[in-house]
Amino acid sequence: AATIDRAVDIYAEMLARDDVTNLFGLAGAMVPTGMRAIVADLIRDGHIDALVTTGANLTHDAIEAIGGKHHHGRADPHDPHPAGDDGGGGGSGTAREHDETLRDEGVDRIYNVYLPQEHFALFESHLRDNVFPTVERRVSIQEFTSALGRANAAQNEERDVDEDSGIAAAAYENDVPIYCPAI
């Protein structure tokens, strides 16, 4: 508890100072697991000056911005507690059989988060139709992620998507650079 108290004090001091640049690192499957809105809000509220993230997080952010959905459920057929469930029994079969069934159904799994493969095709079309035409020359990572954020925001509004336009859009709208070594 003392360590958390100290961390909160340091964070509060950091936010109060104008001479501090706040870098935010976002690694792992944070967007699929539900952290997308929190990070976008931190950007919009001025708490992040630069974002360092993975290509996977930007991919999943764009998928949700243009209407794709991540679904939370069981990690494997023997998991007795799917997300949002307070009990019940597990499924049948082995974890391998579960993954093979998902593959046959065109569904990708990130532990207990599921995403239909068709959403990746939608993302690729989004890149081809809305992002790549605006970056017809070699550009920096920041220019590319800015174009991605602009396109995500535009498509989110045009398609009237229920989900927020997301991290890349918030960064674009607030002039927050994104550094992504994978791009």
Feature map (PLM): residue ranges:
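Metallocofactor- and cofactor-centric catalytic cores in central/energy metabolism, strongly enriched
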Residues: 1-121, 125, 133, 144-162, ...
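Short, compositionally biased low-complexity segments
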Residues: 132-138
